[in-house]
Amino acid sequence: MNQKFLDIYTDSIKNPENFWKKISENIFWYKKPTKILNSDNPPFYKWFQDGTTNTCYNAVDLHVKNGNGEKIAIIYDSPITNSQKKITYAELKDQV
């Protein structure tokens, strides 16, 4: 494994709350969480408990909004039917 990956992995294990706080800054939130990890009731941990986001918006719509609508989002490649289809982010947004 490369060293950068190992450093990131080690950080995520040693300091998970800070690690996921940094990661969470890279996604869109309707309401940003004020607390990253609620560990009051182990082993039932709650992450980003008071935050509100939308996974579909982050995975699809945001790419279109940022000017990447014509980039390929999904490649369907079937060896059974010997067919391939490519779907852009814009097409995917219209379909979901």
What kind of region is each of these model predictions?
Residues 5, 70-72, 80:
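Short amphipathic alpha-helical segments
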Residues 6-11:
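Adenylate-forming
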Residues 56, 74-96:
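Conserved AMP-binding/adenylate-forming core of the ANL superfamily
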